[in-house]
């Protein structure tokens, strides 16, 4: 695909071979007008592995132009959109003995795939065994634009959550959510219109970064990621932890970063069970006081669920006047949420990481709906209280006359 030539030229200048595999023919053709391929991303992933097989053959074929010139011990896969999901399937298929939906189709790849890059990927278009794809011990980078009008939810974050590191080697996964980036401008041919005619007028194109700036972001993150995962140049790791470390290279915009490496030890990720007092670590304990909201639930994206859970905590102080401050609340009524762990020893390179976001829900959810406690009691028409009030109203009316 010539739309990625800019990326190929950059990587080639850094000693990395980039081969673009055109799989657009799988999207459909005129012959599919009454029904074509569906849920075909497994085919895309399989096709990538078959291409790698050919490259391995060329590397070993005497007299071939590429004989001995390919470092087959250091391989990476890059995909965009549906291809962004396909590279995840390829990484999963690479270590399997059979196609997961049909054991009559044997696999025997086992290539040295060190890393995967997903640009604005979809997720769940193909589900092996009716489950979402997941793979282990391969580094992962996902880039997604906040103004993506094609894949409008940050679907690569779902794949991010499912990646695990289990061996003794160093791996990491990173996510970068970019304000002003759309779906198409990572490819020089796709352009600014993510929806296609006649819906272009529905898009606010003024929010977009320029195509040059968006492609620069792709160049910086992808080349740095491959330098780390294929060449072990870990001096670029800080870029994926904090985008401000790349301010000299990156265009001016907002970057939201996620990062987790194989040394990461979760304390409380809220995915382990439904016990609000437990932590991911078996030796931890949670306590909470005076919280009006305390629950754990699935995180919602724009259109889907993220595939992981979070703590939702809220509190509400009924202050009597606008001038009141937190200092007027007795200590016994202060809200708190605490994670208690046994004493542990950590070295100076360790960091405690919190991931937090503001919720738009009410801090007093039990004041309305089925939880309402302060609704006036419904009076019985024959009750003594009702009769007494009626009598008093009648007396007042007589006085007015």
Predicted features by range, described:
Residues 2-30, 38-46, 172-175, 179:
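Active-site machinery of serine-nucleophile hydrolases
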Residues 14-19, 71-74, 111-115, 136-141, ...:
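Loop/turn elements at helix/coil->beta-strand transitions in domains of secreted/extracellular proteins
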Residues 27-32, 86, 125-129, 150-153, ...:
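Extracytoplasmic/secreted cell-surface and envelope-processing proteins
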Residues 32-81:
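Gly/Ser-rich "nucleophile elbow"/oxyanion-hole loop immediately N-terminal to the catalytic nucleophile
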Residues 84-96:
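Short glycine-enriched nucleophile-adjacent loop
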Residues 98-121:
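A conserved short beta-strand
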Residues 133-211:
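Active-site-adjacent alpha-helix of alpha/beta-hydrolase-fold enzymes
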Residues 180-182, 189-340, 347-353, 357-364, ...:
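Alpha/beta-hydrolase-fold serine-hydrolase catalytic core, especially in secreted/extracellular enzymes
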């Amino acid at each position: 695909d010539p739309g990625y030539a800019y990326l190929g030229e950059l990587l080639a200048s850094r000693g990395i071979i980039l081969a673009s595999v055109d799989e657009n023919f799988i999207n459909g053709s005129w012959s599919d007008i009454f029904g074509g391929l569906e849920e075909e991303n497994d085919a895309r992933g399989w096709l990538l592995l078959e291409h790698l097989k050919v490259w391995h053959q060329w590397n070993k074929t005497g007299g071939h132009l590429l004989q001995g010139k390919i470092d087959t011990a250091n391989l990476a896969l890059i995909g965009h959109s549906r291809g962004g999901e396909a590279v995840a399937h390829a990484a999963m298929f690479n270590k399997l003995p059979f196609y997961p939906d049909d054991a009559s189709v044997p696999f025997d790849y086992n290539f040295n795939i060190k890393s995967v890059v997903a640009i604005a990927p979809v997720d769940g278009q193909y589900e092996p065994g009716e489950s979402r794809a997941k793979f282990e011990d391969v580094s992962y980078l996902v880039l997604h634009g906040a103004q993506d009008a094609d894949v409008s939810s940050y679907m690569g974050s779902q794949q991010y959550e499912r990646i695990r590191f289990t061996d003794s080697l160093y791996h990491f996964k990173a996510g970068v959510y970019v304000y002003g980036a759309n779906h198409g401008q990572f490819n020089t041919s796709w352009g600014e219109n993510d929806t296609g005619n006649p819906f272009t007028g529905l898009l606010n194109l003024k929010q977009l970064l320029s195509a040059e700036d968006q492609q620069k972001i792709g160049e910086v993150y992808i080349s740095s990621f491959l330098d780390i995962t294929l060449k072990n140049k870990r001096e670029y790791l800080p870029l994926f932890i904090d985008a401000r470390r790349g301010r000299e290279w990156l265009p001016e915009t907002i970057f939201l970063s996620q990062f987790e490496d194989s040394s990461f030890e979760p304390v409380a990720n809220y995915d382990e069970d439904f016990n609000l007092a437990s932590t991911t670590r078996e030796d931890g304990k949670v306590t909470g006081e005076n919280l009006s909201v305390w629950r754990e639930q699935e995180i919602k994206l724009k259109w889907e669920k993220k595939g992981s859970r979070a703590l939702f905590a809220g509190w509400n102080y009924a202050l009597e006047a606008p001038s009141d401050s937190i200092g007027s609340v007795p200590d016994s009524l202060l809200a708190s949420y605490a994670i208690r762990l046994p004493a542990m020893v950590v070295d100076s390179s360790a960091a405690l990481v919190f991931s937090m976001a503001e919720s738009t829900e009410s801090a007093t959810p039990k004041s309305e709906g089925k939880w309402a406690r302060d609704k006036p009691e419904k009076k019985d028409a024959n009750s003594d209280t009702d009769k007494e009030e009626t009598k008093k109203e009648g007396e007042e009316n007589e006085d007015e006359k």
